[in-house]
């Protein structure tokens, strides 16, 4: 939805002062630009793999501000700001992460595709979701969430000294237009500090979509030399979607650590009900573990749904663990 200043006014009480001031300053250009407020609220009751009973986020909760300005000649300026939070407490999702943790980008979009600058998901994490029954979005049941990219952080230290998984700071992102179903995607980060001898981050993905089929081949390397390679294939016919993926990630060290993950998934749509199941086998330096996930969603509307999720981890060495829960998601 397109928002007026009146709609924004209550929001100013919770947004950082700088962001509110920036939106007010942009008011004179509101007629030429479209600003959209969207997001998702998710909360569930569940028992985790650590056997703790919790009320909290099972999927993700976020508030997003995005917009575009028509510059003429088929060219548009774009921006996106996404804040992630815990719906059960209202707190920022993880201590140490930036306020606009989900994304903070500005860019240009046209016949050439789209280029963005700032913070966003890298090329692998931004495109792998189509090959998991839960879209890599369920901490209980998703084989992707619990296994993919096991040894790979987009940056080992960019999260206030801790590892950053999935997102790049100071990044450049490019998505090509689709030509006969084919598209190319790139992400990279090249900024460094004086005396910093780290390398660059760069990733590339090739995707195809058509005739019910989707396929991807993607890879990325972070500034520490860690690598990830991802391959996925899915087919949708009628109410069924079948999918599979293979992921290989290597942590660069004096003795490298290699994780290999193969996953399979199925999704069946039955009116307002979606049934899901997935399996994954993970091998980390010869230590194997398999994972099984099952779940069901029921959609009350296009925006509101309830779900049930179950996941079980079965390592060859150590104890098995199960997680299960129910939840509700509302998008706007």
Give residue spans per PLM region.
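Outer-membrane beta-barrel "beta-signal"
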Residues: 294, 320-332
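Gram-negative outer-membrane beta-barrel proteins
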Residues: 45-51, 85-91, 123-127, 192-194, ...
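Outer membrane beta-barrel
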Residues: 33-47, 52-191, 198-200, 207-209
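Transmembrane beta-barrel strands of outer-membrane/channel proteins
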Residues: 41-45, 81-83, 119, 186-188, ...
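Structural signature of outer-membrane beta-barrel channels/translocons
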Residues: 66-70, 109-111, 175-178, 207-211, ...
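Detector for outer-membrane/organellar transmembrane beta-barrel domains
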Residues: 199-293
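Repeated loop/turn-to-beta-strand initiation elements of outer-membrane beta-barrel proteins
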Residues: 35, 74-77, 112-116, 181-184, ...
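Cleavable N-terminal export/targeting peptides
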Residues: 1-34
């Amino acid at each position: 939805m397109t928002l007026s200043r009146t709609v924004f006014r209550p929001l100013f009480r919770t947004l950082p002062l700088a962001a509110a001031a920036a939106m007010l300053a942009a008011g004179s250009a509101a007629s030429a630009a479209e600003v959209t407020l969207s997001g998702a609220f998710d909360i569930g009751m569940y028992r985790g793999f650590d056997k703790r009973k919790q009320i909290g986020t099972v999927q993700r909760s976020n508030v997003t501000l995005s917009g575009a300005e028509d510059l003429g000649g088929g060219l548009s300026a774009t921006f996106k700001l996404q804040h992630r939070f815990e719906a059960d407490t209202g707190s920022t999702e993880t201590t140490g992460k930036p306020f606009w943790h989900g994304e903070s980008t500005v860019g240009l979009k046209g016949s050439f595709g789209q280029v963005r600058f700032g913070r966003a998901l890298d090329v692998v994490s931004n495109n792998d979701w189509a090959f998991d029954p839960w879209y890599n979005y369920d901490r209980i049941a998703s084989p992707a969430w619990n296994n993919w990219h096991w040894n790979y952080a987009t940056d080992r230290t960019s999260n206030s000294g801790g590892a950053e998984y999935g997102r790049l700071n100071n990044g450049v992102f490019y998505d090509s237009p689709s030509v006969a179903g084919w598209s190319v995607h790139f992400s990279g980060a090249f900024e460094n500090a004086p005396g910093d001898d780290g390398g660059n981050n760069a990733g590339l993905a090739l995707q195809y979509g058509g005739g019910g089929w989707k396929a991807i081949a993607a890879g990325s390397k972070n500034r520490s030399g860690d690598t990830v390679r991802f391959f996925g294939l899915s087919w949708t016919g009628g109410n069924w979607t079948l999918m599979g993926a293979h992921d290989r990630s290597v942590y660069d060290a004096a003795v490298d650590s290699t994780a290999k993950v193969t996953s399979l998934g199925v999704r069946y749509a039955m009116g307002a009900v979606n049934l899901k199941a997935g399996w994954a086998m993970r091998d980390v330096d010869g230590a194997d573990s398999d994972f099984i996930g099952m779940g069901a969603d029921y959609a009350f509307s296009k925006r509101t749904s309830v779900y049930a999720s179950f996941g079980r981890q079965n390592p060859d060495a150590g104890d098995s663990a199960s997680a299960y829960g129910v939840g509700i998601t509302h998008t706007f």
